[in-house]
Amino acid sequence: MSDLLNQFQSSSEEIRRAAITAASGSSDGEVVQALIRHLAEGSLSESERQLAAESLGKCTLPEIAAILLPMLAAESALTRTMAAAGLGGQQSAAAITALVSGLTDSVNTVRNWSERSLLGLISAVQQYGVESLIALLSHEVRLSRSPAARVLGLTQDERALSPLQLMAEKDSDWLARMAAIKALGDLGFPEALDLVTRALQSDPKNRVRAAAAEALGKLRPHNAEQLLRAALDTDEDEGLQKSAGEALRSLGFEVSAINDDGWE
């Protein structure tokens, strides 16, 4: 048995945690099995099991999915969370489908880890997950709609353009609108410019307007400087001003610095 595998069985949590960290991304079947056993060991601390899940999430051996996918349906929210984290290295259609479903989980940590894993698997999401993510944009729970939008933006898939525009314009929840506006910036299609500009100028929620400023910086319209400087001049919200200033800088324009008291 290798030294690393022996360290997994140490009575010292410090040594075990070091072994878990060293095993991150391993392609050794025995090491991966040790991580899986660690993840499932109920006598260990939650943080140690979570660390094992995160290390497992960087491993790409396909047999991991067969073990973890059923765990996403477990009664224990902690088990579902660790399964979502541990699937972070799996690029199969089954893994992507399961992680997209994880965005609808009733527990926040499961949703968060499902999103985090999907964000690290964008090429596989492009292949297997776009349609199911689009379907989630109309989910009744905003905390499922928002992460679906964020992941979709990074796919840069044209199929997401119209659904994200509809969400950005019509969703009654500002968190969902903010996610959709940000996603439109990441998506990168100029067809979204008019909607993003309207959001910058007139959305009632300051954080949506700030997201629109960020999105304009990514979409890079010919009049970006004019739009962003107008927002700086007319919108007193500091979050919006910070986003507009950062967008201007990203486009190569000079802008005053911002400090804790506002713009200098």
Regions found by a protein language model. Give the residues of each.
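A generic tandem-repeat structural signature
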Residues: 46-123
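Alpha-helix N-cap/helix-start positions at coil->helix boundaries
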Residues: 13-14, 29, 44-47, 62, ...
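Alpha-helical segment of the N-proximal tetratricopeptide repeat
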Residues: 14-26
